[in-house]
Amino acid sequence: MVSLDPINAKFAAAIDGLPAPHQLGGPGKAFENLEELQRHEPANDIATQVIKVEGKYGPTSVTLFRSKALVDKPLPMIFYTHGGGWVMGSAKSFAVLVEDLARRTGAAVIFPDYTLAPHQTFPFPFEQSYEVLEYMIRHGKEYNLLVKTIALAGDSVGGHMAIAMMQMSLQRQLPATISQIVLWAPVTVTHKKYPSYTTFKDGPFLPEATMDWMIDTFIPSKSDRETALASPLTHLPDDVLSKFPPTIIFLSTVDPLVDEGVAFGQRLQGLGVDASVIKAEGQMHAFCLVTALRDGPTAQAVLELAALRLRKIFPDSA
């Protein structure tokens, strides 16, 4: 029997009986609910800069997070794609996590506010996010960024998108080297379910029905789900996946996505990729993001390890 640690158990009890995202009355209400849950005063030590990236898929709002102590220095770049089921999430609701990464790594974290479903569906936000990634690489000097070697990071469906960014960068020859990927509970397959969907059918925080609703909203076409972008675990070719850089995958033991995260890590390992899979015992989905959970000892240890792996490729960062 998998159990939650005291911090996660307390939060699970607090939300028990409350409507899940798919029960709130539509994507707009779900978005508002997450924004309220994650209401956060901007950190005093982190500077933010909001820019607009024009282009075929824009304009896209992009927020750059960096330590105020390093604001005048050229900084390495982490490109972060956020979770929220492709229907929720913003630079505001994810600020507490992204600020932490900027603080711990000494890097600039680039956060695209891609268009959420149902306003745009698969694959538009993937193309939109890649457009931002390529723009930041080509215009890095304008924003005091060091872009020769960069990292990708993302959580949940944002991890799904980070995998897509890597795939697209290889196929389209992004003029930069991606040297590290950091993933939290990534979605890696959308056309089938692994056993943990049944094990954690009722959550907490991410029940099976919510995940089903998110996939149906973002990828309504079932044929689209059986593609490399939508289901990299089962459809991304070996010759592409084998070119992935060192990748670390953090998983929660109480999460419907845990099994597909393990399977993706094992597939990377089988192809010779330097891939690490780490399960955080007693944690639920989004334990490094949710304000009520992220100060727990396990979440803090995971964030410390994530930052360590990121700093490893940025030898000149703080």
Swiss-Prot record:
Report the GO molecular function annotations.
Answer: hydrolase activity
Q: Which UniProt keywords apply?
A: Hydrolase
Top enzyme class, one word, equals hydrolase
Q: Where is the active site?
A: 156, 255, 285
User: Which Gene3D superfamilies does this UniProt record tie to the protein?
Assistant: alpha/beta hydrolase
**Per the record, what phenotype accompanies loss of this gene's function?**
Does not affect tolerance to 2-benzoxazolinone (BOA).
Induction of its expression: Expression is induced in response to 2-benzoxasolinone (BOA) exposure.
Q: What is its EC number?
A: 3.1.1.-
**Which cysteines share a disulfide bond?**
none
Provide the function of this protein: Esterase; part of the Fusarium detoxification of benzoxazolinone cluster 2 (FDB2) involved in the degradation of benzoxazolinones produced by the host plant. Maize, wheat, and rye produce the 2 benzoxazinone phytoanticipins 2,4-dihy-droxy-7-methoxy-1,4-benzoxazin-3-one (DIMBOA) and 2,4-dihydroxy-1,4-benzoxazin-3-one (DIBOA) that, due to their inherent instability once released, spontaneously degrade to the more stable corresponding benzoxazolinones, 6-methoxy-2-benzoxazolinone (MBOA) and 2-benzoxazolinone (BOA), respectively.
Family, according to the entry, reads as follows: Belongs to the AB hydrolase 3 family.
Miscellaneous section: Fusarium verticillioides possesses 2 unlinked loci, FDB1 and FDB2, necessary for detoxification of antimicrobial compounds produced by maize, including 2-benzoxazolinone (BOA). The FDB2 cluster arose as a duplication of the FDB1 cluster with rearrangement and expansion by incorporating additional genes.
Any idea what this protein is called? Esterase FVEG_12639
- State the taxonomy lineage: Eukaryota, Fungi, Dikarya, Ascomycota, Pezizomycotina
